[in-house]
From Swiss-Prot:
Keyword Glycosyltransferase assigned: no
Membrane protein topology class: Multi-pass membrane protein
Residues where heme b b566 binds: H111, H212
PANTHER family on file: CYTOCHROME B
Cofactor note: Binds 2 heme b groups non-covalently.
Additional remarks: Heme 1 (or BL or b562) is low-potential and absorbs at about 562 nm, and heme 2 (or BH or b566) is high-potential and absorbs at about 566 nm.
Gene Ontology molecular function, alphabetical: metal ion binding; ubiquinol-cytochrome-c reductase activity
Name listed for the protein in its UniProt record: Cytochrome b
Transmembrane segments: 45-65, 100-120, 129-149, 156-176, 194-214, 248-268, 298-318, 330-350, 365-385, 391-411
GO cellular component entries: plasma membrane; respiratory chain complex III
Length: 437
């Protein structure tokens, strides 16, 4: 499956042979869980199983919640309170689902930044990376629509602000916005549409996750060195790899148990810590909250959206050159989606021949600045648009684009990487010793 020489499934009994000839599902499962995996994978590689588990958790709890939820502006808020008070275990389902979204995004951000550090986007894994970024976009859309469903103050006004971004598109924007809303403003049609899509999209995400896994099983997994598994012979491949089962499955399950211990501690003891108190007030179109804040996992890109105000020189320049077509609001929308797009383009923006950041000293420095930059954007995204937060968000947004569009391409031409190991086996033995000795 991965092109790495290894033992494949061979049916032994007559029933196994009969089934394998007609539906080779046992062989598919065998080749999936026994796939040769680089033996030097570290703890940064445990977040894939966390993401897979959380996706299943979100789908299951979401289905249960949908059984008791009513997508109507007059009943939605009350139906959520009904779930909390009258449905057996309803409070647990809701808190697991709400905090599960936070765990999902925390895991995906770690997963993305791990990929950026170890060069998991480089050839031949570009398709894996692109599919992953599409999954991330669908996650954002699903989470946004789910946040609207409780029909609290922050739900309603968050929907008003975010759908208003589509209205900023010149010419066709207002029509797209009205089509999304189902009318001139956020109302019952909007709630019904968002509920339908929020129910549907997790299954689309699950299908893309299967493609994502298929893609990296085809190319083989990346690893901390960025060195490819030797494929010249089965003997060489076995020196670089271990079967996914039982070695990495057991490690991943242990890590998952630790993550879930922390997750359920949050669910049990501080389930509303990451929420907003305004969302416990029923939506009121006549009363605007003092400060509209999205969920924490949207804050970095929300900060970029707000960073490019009308008085920023580049916005003034673009506004003038386009004769007002690209105004500050539309520029912010472009910047927000552009910040995600530059991540998707990383395979072509990074010109270095060395895959892993572990052997790129200058890259490491700029990368950790990027991580700090992401944290700063998360912080200022929750702050009001006033001095000094507006300036901090502008500087942080500028660095985000500079890293991908300027620093990454230049590093490939100017950086002198450190020596990389000749094989995964060499790297493994340097850390843990040669098991043959």
């Amino acid at each position: 499956m991965s092109g790495i020489p290894h033992d494949h499934y061979e049916p032994k009994t007559g029933i196994e042979k009969w089934l394998h000839d007609r539906l080779p599902i046992v062989g598919l499962v065998y080749d999936t869980i026994m796939i040769p995996t680089p033996k030097n994978l570290n703890w940064w590689w445990i977040w894939g199983i966390v993401l897979a588990f959380t996706l299943v958790l979100q789908i299951v709890t979401g289905i249960v919640l949908a059984m008791h939820y009513t997508p109507h502006v007059d009943l939605a808020f009350a139906s959520v309170e009904h779930i909390m008070r009258d449905v057996n275990g309803g409070w647990a389902m809701r808190y697991i689902h709400a905090n599960g979204a936070s765990l999902f995004f925390l895991a995906v951000y770690i997963h993305i930044f791990r990929g950026l550090y170890y060069g998991s986007y480089k050839a031949p894994r570009e398709i894996t990376w692109i599919v992953g970024m599409v999954i991330y976009l669908l996650m954002m859309g699903t989470a946004f629509m789910g946040y609207v469903l409780p029909w609290g103050q922050m739900s309603f006004w968050g929907a008003t602000v975010i759908t208003g971004l589509f209205g900023a598109i010149p010419g066709i924007g207002p029509s797209i916005q009205a089509w999304l809303l189902g009318g001139p403003a956020v109302d019952n049609a909007t709630l019904n549409r968002f509920f339908s899509l929020h129910y549907l999209l997790p299954f689309v995400i699950a299908a893309l996750v299967a493609i994502h896994i298929w893609a990296f099983h085809t190319t083989g997994n990346n690893n901390p060195t960025g060195v490819e598994v030797r494929r010249t012979s089965k003997a060489d491949a076995e020196k670089d790899t271990l079967p996914f089962w039982p070695y990495f499955v057991i490690k991943d399950l242990f890590a998952l148990a630790l993550v879930l211990l922390g997750f359920f501690a949050v669910v049990a003891y501080m389930p509303n810590y990451l929420g907003h108190p305004d969302n416990y007030v029923q939506a009121n179109p006549l009363s605007t909250p003092a400060h509209i804040v999205p969920e924490w996992y949207f804050l970095p890109f929300y900060a970029i959206l707000r960073a490019f105000a009308a008085d920023v020189w580049v916005v003034i320049l673009v506004d003038g050159l386009t004769f007002g077509i690209v105004d500050a609001k539309f520029f912010g929308v472009i910047a927000m989606f552009g910040a995600i797009a530059v991540m998707a383009l990383a395979p072509w923006l990074d010109t270095s021949k060395v895959r892993s950041g572990a052997y790129r000293p200058k890259f490491r420095m700029w990368f950790w600045f990027l991580v700090l930059d992401f944290v700063v954007l998360t912080w200022v995204g929750a702050m009001p648009t006033e001095y000094p937060y507006d300036w901090i968000s502008l500087i942080a947004s500028t660095y985000w684009f500079a890293y991908f569009l300027v620093i990454l391409p230049l590093l490939g031409a100017t950086e002198k990487p450190e020596p990389i190991p000749a094989s995964i086996e060499e790297d493994f033995n340097s850390h843990y010793g040669n098991p043959a000795e």
